[in-house]
Design a protein with these regions (language model features):
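Conserved phosphate- and dinucleotide-binding cores of soluble alpha/beta proteins
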Residues: 27-223
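N-terminal active-site beta-alpha-beta segment that forms phosphate/nucleotide-binding
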Residues: 1-45
Length: 223
């Protein structure tokens, strides 16, 4: 940002110290947050001009046409898993067990002009880039770019971004090749076995059914 004189107009989301520091250094014009992740962010709301609080409805309510997520140019998000259709899972682990909550992940992905997922290719012995995610939290039609430590992949639905990367000389590969690279390192995982019982339902932003989480079957070892 210093080298190219880049300044962000504003930033939203869960805020922590690094974003507060960017605001205080003049690299970000305004910070509007719906939750804080550390005390530096909490204190900044009271002490730093240009740091504002907003409600969850102002942040990402699908029925609110003025929601801030709909005004984002870019959003950078993480993932537990991402598959070759660019579907993202941030809810369940590779073992099918609930790990947390989606938060604003699907909202910011859908509302922004460009959604960038940043994640390592593998975690330990698990492939982050895979054939099919355990649970769809954010659908692939809302995800534009995947950035890993082994390469960048662009959703084929965004030929405009592919053209931009080509013009900038930024190399990129297919997401299928990243999946195969991950499997070549850690192996292809066995599918998680589930029972019929549904323990959680995932709704899309429009209220339609996106996916379900089922009770996992107890793991058994082969004799």
């Amino acid at each position: 940002m210093d080298e190219r004189g880049i300044k962000m107009g504003w930033a939203i989301g869960g805020i922590c110290k690094p974003m507060v520091e960017l605001l205080q250094k003049g690299k970000v014009g305004k910070v509007i947050d719906v939750q804080d992740f550390d005390l530096d962010a909490v204190n900044s709301i009271n002490q730093t001009p240009g740091h504002f609080e907003m409600s969850a409805s102002q942040y990402a309510n699908p029925a609110n046409k003025g929601a801030f997520v709909n005004k984002l140019d870019f959003v950078v998000l993480a993932a537990l898993e991402i598959d070759t259709d660019f579907n993202v899972n941030v809810l369940t682990g590779s073992d099918g067990v609930l790990r947390g909550a989606p938060g604003g992940h699907p909202d910011t992905a859908a509302g922004s002009k460009c959604c960038i997922i940043v994640t390592p290719l593998i975690r330990g012995r698990m492939a982050t880039v895979c054939e099919k995610v355990v649970t769809v939290t954010t659908p692939g039609d809302c995800v534009d770019v995947l950035v890993t430590d082994y390469g960048i992949a662009v959703n084929p639905r965004r030929p405009d971004l592919i053209e931009c990367l080509d013009k900038a000389g930024i190399p990129h590969v297919s997401i299928e090749s990243l999946k195969e690279k991950a499997y070549s390192i850690v192996g292809r995982p066995d599918e998680v076995q589930f029972e019929d019982q549904v323990v959680a339902v995932l709704e899309a932003r429009d209220g339609t059914l996106l996916d379900v989480v089922r009770k996992i079957k107890p793991y058994t070892f082969d004799d």
